[in-house]
Amino acid sequence: VNTHQKTRKLNLIIVALLLAFVSGCSTLAKKDDTGVVIANRAQIRSSVAVVAADLLEVSRGDVVDIMDSTAAENGETWYHVRGHDEVQTEGWIEARNIMSQAVLDQARVLAEEDKDIPAQATGQLRASTNLRLSPERSGSENIMMKLDSGSSFEIVGWKRVPAPKSEETTFESDDAPKPGSVQQNSGRKRKDGDEPKEPEETNELWYKVRLQPSISPAPAGWIYGKQVELTVPSDIIFYRTGREFVAWQRLDEDPDAKSSETKDKDVAKESKPGSWVILEKSSSNEPRKLDEPDFDRIYVLGYDKYNQEHYTAYRSPDLKGVLPLRLQGKGDSKNFVIRVQGDDGQPKEAQYTVYRDDRGNLKVAAPGEAQKTKKKK
């Protein structure tokens, strides 16, 4: 009897160990899932070995079926995938080259939130930077992919958030390790410790961006502000007068054309000069506050086609403005809408009418003002 009980206990232990093993393996990857290639180009290989053969080249945006995953000797995670080519090639690809369908779906939700908001500005990356699902960098869980240096995009909004304390993040430049790789932070920390410490900022700026498929399969996401260079159009960049341009839209743009093309790397180039509405913000050496306005002045720049020169059509008094900037109407009958903080601190919609006087000069009527036209004698 004792022998029978011992055998039964041993069998129960073996079954429990097998269940634990299977459960542990299932957490490595979700089977029957799909993913999209985020690398510009990558190879599906015959195995995870260094000497494995290349079976199929895939490009950014290609979809693959994820069947399993494993960890290589160097700690890199690899996915066993099936390609969507004619022969449905099966092989292995590094996990860092793949974005899961679940993450892509979350990025599409972000894009849907701002689908009706026109581009407020355009920008490009100063260096290779992470595209994230949320505006915070204390960890790597919200990283979707790493964007290449020089990547261009539309900016649809921005947000100031409390800056993480230095001990809460080792990614001061938002340069996180590749997904699936072993993190080795000790050397980085020692290097940072040898450098002079700069005063910690109390909060930091993040941009919410819209991206072309050629740049990222994820249509939207958040980028750490210090890695972004605003690409102010060459037509207006020399009209900055001590304040930074934070948003801009052409007033004479074809309404059937896209609001902003970011396919070309040099997104600051404009085909021809024109009239613009520009939102400005005063420069300051003081730390920015979380609740400060997005802009504090409106600048409308007209263009004289005959003399081929710009002129100031309107410059508002200082105000506390809130994005987004929306342009409405067609031809000479246009207006733009913003939000302005009132005395009670609540933003209220303000509509500015754009028109031309009898001499053809561009004018702007602020809310509550009538259009001023010069009577002909």
Residue map of PLM features:
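Bacterial N-terminal signal peptides that target proteins for export
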Residues: 2-14
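Conserved beta-strand/loop element in small beta-rich adapter and peptidoglycan-binding domains
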Residues: 53-72, 139-201
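A eukaryote-biased signal for long
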Residues: 313-342
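C-terminal motif of bacterial Sec signal peptides marking the signal peptidase cleavage site
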Residues: 21-24
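Short beta-strand elements that form the blades of beta-propeller/WD-repeat-like
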Residues: 273-291, 332-343
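Short, structured beta-strand/loop micro-motifs enriched in basic residues and often containing a Trp
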Residues: 40-49, 126-138
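Short acidic/glycine-enriched loop/turn segments that link adjacent beta-strands
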Residues: 74-77
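Boundary regions of SH3-family modules and the immediately adjacent low-complexity/disordered segments
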Residues: 26-34, 39, 43, 65, ...
